[in-house]
Amino acid sequence: MVESVLVPVDGSPLSARALSFVSREFPDASVHLLYVVDHVEASYDFDWTSLPGYWDDSPGEATNRGKDVLADARETAENANLTVVAEELAVGRPSSSIVTYATEESVDHVVMGSHGREGLSRFVLGSVAEQVLRRSTVPVTIVR
């Protein structure tokens, strides 16, 4: 029986579909929401304005986006009558962060979208799903 589910979210429509899947298939499970700021993206959070000649129009943008995505995902989950027990914003390699979180928090299942944002990121995030499938020690459901 699945008691806890990790749903990595990125603000894409497939993240919402993953939550919808959880509400249908695991309605009584405790839900963990995870947003991972890619360590490369996080490097842009540095306040470059402190260095002469550099300008950053949005310090902390990646982290702020993560907080917004988590808040939206919580609302979506609660509207689907799911119980959210944790929201985590992590910085690192997305696939490693997802697998590590699933292991450390002893979740029973991971449900995630097959890919996320458009363009080049779509291919990168598609490879994230593949890497999580290969490395996870718990069952993984990929939603399309």
Model-based region annotation:
Residues 75-110:
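Structural beta-alpha unit
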Residues 1-6, 16, 21, 124, ...:
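Terminal disorder- and signal-encoded targeting elements
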Residues 25-30, 82-83, 138:
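Short glycine/proline-enriched coil/turn segments at helix->beta-strand junctions
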Residues 32-34, 85-90, 141:
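General small-molecule cofactor/ligand-binding pocket signal
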